[in-house]
Structures are given as structure tokens and as C-alpha cells.
């Protein structure tokens, strides 16, 4: 009987000890300490990821600006084709007028040829 009593007392003490350890392990201050440790370990990596993402965002924004600027330049060039056609037409008219002037000077007896001496 005494042996069973002793066994029961030992079991109660062990249960109380286990309960106390469980309570201490899950106490709010311990939980906050564990949370702090987790943040301390995780934060540098998260900061590095954030820095990398910001750098990639800046590079992407620069590339987007460059592409938009290039598209704008190409669009301006396609819109300027009318001006190039106008210049082409004016150059053709000028060449035609010069040929007419050259032909009329070549037929005119009063016009002297330019001298070759400089």
C-alpha cells in the first residue's frame, strides 16, 4: 500500500512539475522573447529583399521610360513623312528650275561663260 501511495505522490509531483514547465514555456513574456528572436533573425533578409525589389523597380522604370521615349520618337518619325515628302517635292522643283535656267543660259548668245581663272 505504501508503495502505491508513494507512486501516486510521485506521479502528482511529476504532473505538477510538467504543468509548471508547460506554463513557463508558454508564458507571454517567453512568447514575446521568441517573437523578438524570430524578427531579429528574419529582418535582415527581409530588408535585403526589399532593397533588391526597389533596385529592380528603379531599373524597370528606367527601361520603361526608354522604351516609351523610343516609341514616341518612332511615332514622330512616321508622322514626319509628310514633311519629307514636301521637302522631296521642293527639291525636285528646284532641280527642274535649275535645269531650265541652265538650258536657257546655254541658248542665250548674250551670256558669257564664267572664266576658269580664280
UniProtKB/Swiss-Prot annotation:
It is found in: Lysosome membrane. Residues 98-107 have a biased composition (Polar residues). GO terms for cellular component: BORC complex; lysosomal membrane. InterPro entries: BORCS8 (IPR019320). Residues 98-118 are annotated as: Disordered. Keywords: Lysosome, Membrane. Disulfide bonds: none annotated. Belongs to the BORCS8 family. As part of a BORC-like complex, it may play a role in the movement and localization of lysosomes at the cell periphery. Associated with the cytosolic face of lysosomes, this complex may couple lysosomes to microtubule plus-end-directed kinesin motors, driving lysosome movement toward the cell periphery. This is BLOC-1-related complex subunit 8. The lineage of its organism: Eukaryota, Metazoa, Chordata, Craniata, Vertebrata.
Amino acid at each position: 500500500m505504501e508503495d502505491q501511495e508513494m507512486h501516486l505522490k510521485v506521479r502528482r509531483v511529476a504532473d505538477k512539475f510538467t504543468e509548471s514547465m508547460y506554463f513557463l514555456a508558454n508564458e507571454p513574456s517567453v512568447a514575446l522573447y521568441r517573437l523578438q528572436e524570430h524578427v531579429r533573425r528574419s529582418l535582415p533578409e527581409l530588408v535585403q529583399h526589399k532593397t533588391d525589389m526597389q533596385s529592380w523597380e528603379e531599373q524597370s522604370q528606367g527601361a520603361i521610360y526608354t522604351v516609351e521615349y523610343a516609341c514616341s520618337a518612332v511615332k514622330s518619325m512616321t508622322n514626319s513623312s509628310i514633311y519629307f515628302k514636301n521637302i522631296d517635292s521642293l527639291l525636285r522643283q528646284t532641280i527642274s528650275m535649275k535645269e531650265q535656267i541652265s538650258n536657257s543660259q546655254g541658248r542665250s548668245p548674250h551670256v558669257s561663260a564664267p572664266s576658269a581663272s580664280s
